[in-house]
């Protein structure tokens, strides 16, 4: 019974599809016939002019013709107007439903019954969507006669449940970047269609993605009350800034027109004006060019008028080659907005990348996709300017040019750390080899292409990441770490590298939560706590401070703190005469107990092993991950407040700052300077302090001259 029912449904759907196609063909034939009759009627009316005495007869004839002619048929759709096949893609569900609704609304006479509508929508499905429809109609027969319920079931199955979450994530990451306001506004409104935000929320989010110069100009204007008004203001500001920038450009003086070099055997036609419209050739000139086998268009030999190069150079603008334009839609999707440059379009495939550095602003950089490059490369000057952390490669790589010779910059010995890189809504973790690439700061080569296997349309410069690797690895959105807190005051250290300010290490940012209340009882390497304390002999005579009384809430908080730490084994009985100073701070609804152990440490024996595993704790230069250049401005107060003396850069080097988890060295770019006043600089402290030199060995005993 089930197979028979399925066959009946399939046969009925096929019959309806054939009827729709036949009806469309008949409509097309009727339209062509009506058009021919209309043209013939118009021609006859122009040829025959009615006389005044035959007006009554003409009126009767026209009335009879109007009565005999059938009414004009309702304009029907061509087969090309049918909706596109739906294969179950959630992104194409809304357009498919809208196309089906529009098609059926235009032909209400044919789709007046729900059964016909359901069969038509089912016939427009393919793949897994068609399999779902057949199984659903077989189990639920009532859906065949209930079109709204069938559409609701299809929407419930194929609609993306995370559509709003994805749109929210996209719109928060959307930035104007180097693109225009119009492109940014179009992308913003496309994403906002999937959100249920109100007008003020959309206005605030639109403000967040604008570029800095547009936001600065908006601060001088009145606040817009709607999103459309705000978009209009931004477009007006951008055009005004573009006009001002064009007016500031120096105008080049007019250049004299230089005629191209013409062969001596060619005679210039004086009837052809330079730069104007071409005049018709005389019959004598045509005959002369035909006899000499010259081109009828430009008058030179070697070709004919069909493939004359002068036509191509005239049709294409100056500076561009003839042919289709190479600038197409953005290759990074609606999240990153790119605009083509004002100059001639580049023959290379370029995309806009976003490089996220923890605790720092996002870097926007143009990258070239080159299938001839073996790896992913980044320019060393760009690395030095932006302070991107590096490490030494396990094995150096020798890069060869197209002629087989090694490049002038030498082998590649450094690479960047794993960086979070965005290409539109495509996010990945990349590591670049550092080399010399002045024209393109970033180059994505065969390694990147083979890993992601993108679908590139070279004619339109569009990229689609639809491979299995990208589906499971690259479309996972991970939150970008927030900005780092302001750096703590530096210790009083000074190095003769004036002009560079040292910052706290970024690599320790990922372990900043090791001292949270969740991890306060966890020790590294499962090491057991050793609370044994040894006192200095005679510590009982050390004077103690004052003892103050506590209130009932403070005493209860102190008892709870002591009981909890005794239970965890962090506090044990001791024979020390004095304890640590206790200070209670109100945090929210409870009192937080803090204590100062500096006084008890004065009469206890300190352990000799280092208390932290961070190497060279006191040396801030070893902890630096990047440096920032500080310009020499008169009156600029340097930090620390030591007197700054002029230094002279003599070279560039990579400074070691530590090792990563795999044991590879970490390097940062620094400037090597020479300071002639080095003797006037404060002394550099050493950690640990240097040990005194060992005493000299005793002198050898004097030789003995005793004889036997």
Curated annotation (Swiss-Prot):
Composition bias, Polar residues: 26-36
GO cellular-component term (any): membrane
Residue ranges of coiled coil: 1-50
Keywords linked to the UniProt accession: Apoptosis, Coiled coil, Cytoplasm, Differentiation, DNA-binding, Isopeptide bond, Membrane, Metal-binding, Methylation, Nucleus, Phosphoprotein, RNA-binding, Transport, Transposable element, Ubl conjugation, Zinc, Zinc-finger
Zn finger limits (CCHC-type): 293-310
Annotated compartments: Extracellular vesicle membrane; Cytoplasm; Nucleus
GO molecular function: DNA binding; mRNA binding; RNA binding; zinc ion binding
UniProt induction comment: Expression is directly regulated by E2F1 and E2F4, which bind to its promoter and direct its expression. Up-regulated by MYC. Strongly overepressed in a number of tumors, such has hepatocellular carcinoma (HCC), pancreatic or neuroendocrine prostate cancers.
Region entry Disordered, spans: 21-74, 310-344, 683-708
Region feature (Necessary for interaction with ACVRL1): 76-275
Location in chain, cross-link Glycyl lysine isopeptide (Lys-Gly) (interchain with G-Cter in ubiquitin): 311, 314
Biological processes per GO annotation: apoptotic process; cell differentiation; mRNA transport; negative regulation of transforming growth factor beta receptor signaling pathway; protein homooligomerization; vesicle-mediated intercellular transport; viral translational frameshifting
Tissue: Expressed in the cytotrophoblast layer but not in the overlying syncytiotrophoblast of the placenta. Expressed in prostate and breast carcinomas but not in normal breast and prostate epithelial cells. Expressed in the Hep-G2 cell line (at protein level). Expressed in brain, liver, spleen, kidney, thymus, lung, ovary, testis, reactive lymph node, skeletal muscle, adipose tissue and placenta. Expressed in pancreatic and hepatocellular carcinomas (HCC).
Annotated Basic and acidic residues bias: 37-48
Applied biotechnology uses: Can be reprogrammed to form virion-like capsids that deliver engineered cargo mRNAs bearing RNA signals from PEG10 5'- and 3'-UTR into target cells.
Residues where Omega-N-methylarginine is found: 507, 598, 611
Oligomer status and interactors: Homooligomer; homooligomerizes into virion-like capsids. Interacts with ACVRL1. Interacts with SIAH1 and SIAH2.
Further remark: The PEG10 locus is imprinted, giving rise to paternally expressed proteins.
Reported function: Retrotransposon-derived protein that binds its own mRNA and self-assembles into virion-like capsids. Forms virion-like extracellular vesicles that encapsulate their own mRNA and are released from cells, enabling intercellular transfer of PEG10 mRNA. Binds its own mRNA in the 5'-UTR region, in the region near the boundary between the nucleocapsid (NC) and protease (PRO) coding sequences and in the beginning of the 3'-UTR region. Involved in placenta formation: required for trophoblast stem cells differentiation. Involved at the immediate early stage of adipocyte differentiation.
Domains (record comment): The protein is evolutionarily related to retrotransposon Gag proteins: it contains the capsid (CA) and nucleocapsid (NC) subdomains of gag.
Protein name per Swiss-Prot or TrEMBL: Retrotransposon-derived protein PEG10
Organism: Homo sapiens (Human)
Source lineage: Eukaryota, Metazoa, Chordata, Craniata, Vertebrata
């Amino acid at each position: 019974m089930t197979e028979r029912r399925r066959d009946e449904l399939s046969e009925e759907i096929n019959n309806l599809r054939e009827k729709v196609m036949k009806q469309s063909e008949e409509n097309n034939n009727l339209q062509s016939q009506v058009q021919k009759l209309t043209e013939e009627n118009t021609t006859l009316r122009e040829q025959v002019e009615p006389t005044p005495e035959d007006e009554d007869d003409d009126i009767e004839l026209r009335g009879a013709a109007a009565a005999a002619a059938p009414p004009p048929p309702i304009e029907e759709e061509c087969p090309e107007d049918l909706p596109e096949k739906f294969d179950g893609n959630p992104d194409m569900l809304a357009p498919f439903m809208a196309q089906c609704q529009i098609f059926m609304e235009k032909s209400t006479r044919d789709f007046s019954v729900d059964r016909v509508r359901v069969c038509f929508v089912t016939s427009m499905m393919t793949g897994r969507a068609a399999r779902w429809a057949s199984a659903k109609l077989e189990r639920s027969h009532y859906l065949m006669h209930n079109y709204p319920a069938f559409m609701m079931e299809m929407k419930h199955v194929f609609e993306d449940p995370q559509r709003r979450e994805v749109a929210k994530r996209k719109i928060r990451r959307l930035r104007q970047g180097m693109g225009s306001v119009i492109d940014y506004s179009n992308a913003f409104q496309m994403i906002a269609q999937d959100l249920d935000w109100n007008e003020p929320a959309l206005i605030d989010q639109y403000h967040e993605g604008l570029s800095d110069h547009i936001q600065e100009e908006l601060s001088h204007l009145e606040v817009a009350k709607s999103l459309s008004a705000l978009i209009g203001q931004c477009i007006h500001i951008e055009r005004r800034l573009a006009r001002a920038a064009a007016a500031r450009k120096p105008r080049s003086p007019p250049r004299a027109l230089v005629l191209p070099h013409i062969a001596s055997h060619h005679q210039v036609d004086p009837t052809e004006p330079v730069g104007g419209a071409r005049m018709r050739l005389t019959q004598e000139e045509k005959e002369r060019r035909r006899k000499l086998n010259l081109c009828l268009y430009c008058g030179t030999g070697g070709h004919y008028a069909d493939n004359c190069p002068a036509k191509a150079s005239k049709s294409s603008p100056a500076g561009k080659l003839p042919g289709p334009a190479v600038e197409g839609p953005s290759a990074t999707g609606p999240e990153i907005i790119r605009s083509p440059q004002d100059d001639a379009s580049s023959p290379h495939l370029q995309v806009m990348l976003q490089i996220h550095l923890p605790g720092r602003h996002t870097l926007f950089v143009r990258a070239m996709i080159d299938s001839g490059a073996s790896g992913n490369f980044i320019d060393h000057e760009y690395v030095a300017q932006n302070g991107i952390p590096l490490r030494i490669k396990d094995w150096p790589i020798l890069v060869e040019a197209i002629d087989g010779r090694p490049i002038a910059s030498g082998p590649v010995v450094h690479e960047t750390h794993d960086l979070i890189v965005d290409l539109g809504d495509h996010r990945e973790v990349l590591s670049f080899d550092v080399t010399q690439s002045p024209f393109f700061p970033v180059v994505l080569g065969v390694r990147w292409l083979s890993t992601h296997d993108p679908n590139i349309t070279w004619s339109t410069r569009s990229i689609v990441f639809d491979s299995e690797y990208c589906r499971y690895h690259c479309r996972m959105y991970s939150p970008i770490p927030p900005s780092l807190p302001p750096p703590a005051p530096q210790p009083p250290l000074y190095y003769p590298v004036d002009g560079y300010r040292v910052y706290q290490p970024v690599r320790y940012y990922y372990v900043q939560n090791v001292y949270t209340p969740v991890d306060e009882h966890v020790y590294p390497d499962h090491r057991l706590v050793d609370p044994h304390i040894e006192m200095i002999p005679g510590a009982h005579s050390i004077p103690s401070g004052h003892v103050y009384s506590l209130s009932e809430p403070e005493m209860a908080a102190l008892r709870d703190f002591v009981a909890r730490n005794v239970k965890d084994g962090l506090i044990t009985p001791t024979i020390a005469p004095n304890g640590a100073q206790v200070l209670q701070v109100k945090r929210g609804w409870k009192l937080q107990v803090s204590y100062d152990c500096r006084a008890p440490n004065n009469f206890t024996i300190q352990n000799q092993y280092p208390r932290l595993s961070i190497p060279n704790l006191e040396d801030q230069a070893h902890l630096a991950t990047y440096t920032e250049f500080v310009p020499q401005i008169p009156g600029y107060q340097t930090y620390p407040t030591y007197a700054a003396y002029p230094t002279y850069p003599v070279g560039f080097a990579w400074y070691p700052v530590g090792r990563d988890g795999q044991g590879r060295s970490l390097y940062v770019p620094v400037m090597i300077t020479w300071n002639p006043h080095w003797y006037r600089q404060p002394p550099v402290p050493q950690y640990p302090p240097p040990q005194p030199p060992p005493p000299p060995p005793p002198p050898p005993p004097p030789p003995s001259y005793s004889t036997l």
